[in-house]
Design a protein with these regions (language model features):
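Expand to "…catalyze enediolate/carbanion chemistry for C-C bond making/breaking, isomerization
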Residues: 1-232
Length: 232
């Protein structure tokens, strides 16, 4: 954890802080370093919509070492080959978009953990401190990190949420309000009463499951977030 600030992020959550982050879509890692210096608790490095390759992803993650900001990386999908490319870079969290059902959730969780908890391939690189960390310590850490963050951003996923939340190993649910509104035929209208009702349902069920709750937010959404006990 000393290489990705995960413990610092989790301690802030436990202390009741609403952690804030910055979404990174540009290739220059200086942008990520600037975000950390600006005081953000985490950076969401976007491999789904951003123009980033694996080498660039590594540079963004390294840019946060020595800061107080945790690197989260959003992969393009729950495909284990996509997750494998990033997880060896030792980000604090893996964000998996468009999780639709319990099968997607289980697939993502297993891709992030070694056997017997999952099916991650054994690639000891940065998380193993390039061979300087005792193997026992590394494997113990690998059972807890990175955070496995699943995005609920489609009405189909909401309908399947009860089953999704029953999958062992999920660390956090992150709400995607804009994609959710699109899937409801209300594109961009996150404040519509029907969308708000669905967002509230996701919040309540996630909190009741004892799972960390995050959300994408712009200025207007931030007021809604504070009222729903969203943690980051």
């Amino acid at each position: 954890m000393r290489y990705n600030n995960l413990e610092l992020f989790l301690n802030s959550i436990k202390a009741g802080k609403l952690c804030t982050g910055c979404c990174i879509t540009f290739s220059d890692p200086a942008v990520t370093e600037i975000a950390a210096e600006a005081g953000f608790d985490f950076c969401w490095i976007d491999g789904e919509h951003g123009i980033l390759d694996r080498t660039t992803a590594m540079m963004h993650i390294l840019a946060l070492k020595g800061t107080k900001c945790a690197p989260f990386y959003r992969v393009p999908s729950c495909d284990h080959t996509e997750i494998k490319k990033i997880i060896d870079l030792a980000p604090a969290g893996i964000i998996v978009p468009m999780v639709m059902n319990e099968s997607d959730a289980e697939y993502a969780v297993k891709a992030c953990r070694y056997p017997l908890s999952g099916n991650r391939g054994c690639g000891m690189r940065r998380g193993h401190c390039y061979g300087t960390m005792p193997m026992e310590e590394y494997m113990k850490n690998a059972e807890k990190e990175p955070l496995i963050i699943l995005q609920i951003e489609h009405i189909e996923a909401v309908r399947n949420l009860d089953k999704i939340l029953q999958i062992p190993g999920i660390d956090s649910i992150m709400i995607g309000p804009y994609d959710l509104s699109c899937s409801m035929g209300l594109a961009g209208q996150w404040a519509h009463s029907e969308v708000i009702a669905v967002l509230d349902e996701v919040c309540e069920k996630t909190r009741n499951a004892g799972i960390l709750l995050g959300a994408y937010a712009e200025t207007d959404l931030s007021r809604w977030i504070k009222k729903r006990q969203i943690q980051y």
